[in-house]
Amino acid sequence: MNICVNSLYRLSTPQFQNLYSEEVSDEGLALLIREVENGDQNCIDLLCNLALRNDDLGHKVEKILFDLFSGKKHGSPDIDKKINQACLMLYQTANNDIAKNNTDFKKLHIPSRLLYMAGSATPDFSKKLEIAHKILGDQIAQTEEEQVGVENLWCPARMVSSDELSRATQGMTQGLSLSVNYPIGLIHPTTGENVLSAQLHEKVAQSGLSDNEVFLINTESHWIFCLFYKIAEKIKCLIFNTHHDLNQNTKQEIRAAAKIAGASEEGDVNFIEIDLQNNVPNGCGLFCFQALQLLSATGQNDPVAVLREYSENFLRLSVEEQTLFNTETRRKIHEYSLTS
């Protein structure tokens, strides 16, 4: 028994047995996690089983696995594939005739990280849709152009929806000095009203803009990042667009809205327009999320300089690195839509 446990999991028999107790020792868990990070498949399988627990330890372990899966935490090459295969095996067990009513598998029947990772591994498209529906529920488009619905949630070219962007950006910026508004369409599809102008009118009239006011704006099936910020008490507006240049009508609508916020002089509205999406199809929402993450981390630095430098550096990445960004950022965004 000692030799078997040690060779499979690099744990002593007491450490292994302790994993199934109510109070798991930090030492045994740390040893197991280290082997998981190194890509040991037996340890990954064991940690995925621990993640099924519906207690603090189960949630902690599930988060560690997802951080490795999404690239937030570094592990061995292909660790994401090893983790999602382990989750898929659990999902298949949870849905067989014997186990399907077993409450121990609850996390594989709700919008959990474990279920999302299992869905990414299944080759069965109908199963992917079934799992996607459990995770997404029923979604409603906020604009006529917005693409939503229960399709392949793991498609590398899927458009991120308003609700998904909202949950991700609100979750990421909690406690930070950024005011992030619910994503909007620039122009109302039936009335033709400039929605950004309307929201700015309301904000200015009520409490005024914060020092860093963020809008994620949909312009005909495309997300752009909009930031109103202050430099020496002057309001500036920054538009970060990671695909083809916006048409002049769209730019005029944005400039008209910016005047309401106080960005009324020549040069107060700055457009950064660089196509970053060659290897990140329909990735405009991903870059909005990334822009917010960067500006949250850089604090008082010039946002124009930060996003220009980021864009230039991104274009220097290899195709493989850009493709990895696409995969990992989608996973990080979707994590905010999961309940455990």
Swiss-Prot record:
A biological process term (GO) from this entry: proteolysis
UniProt main location, coarse: secreted
Keyword Hydrolase: yes
Any one cellular-component term (Gene Ontology): extracellular region
InterPro entries per record: ElaD/SseL-like_N, SseL-like_C
Assigned keywords, A-Z: Host cytoplasm, Hydrolase, Protease, Secreted, Thiol protease, Virulence
Active-site feature positions: 222, 284 (nucleophile)
Pfam families associated with the record: ElaD-SseL-like_C, ElaD_SseL-like_N
E.C. numbers: 3.4.22.-
MF GO annotations: cysteine-type peptidase activity
Compartments, record wording: Secreted; Host cytoplasm
Enzyme class label: hydrolase
Family of this protein: Belongs to the peptidase C79 family.
The protein's role, per its UniProt record: Effector proteins function to alter host cell physiology and promote bacterial survival in host tissues. This protease targets the host cell ubiquitin pathway by acting as a deubiquitinase in infected host cells.
Name of the featured protein: Deubiquitinase SseL
Gene from which this protein is expressed: sseL
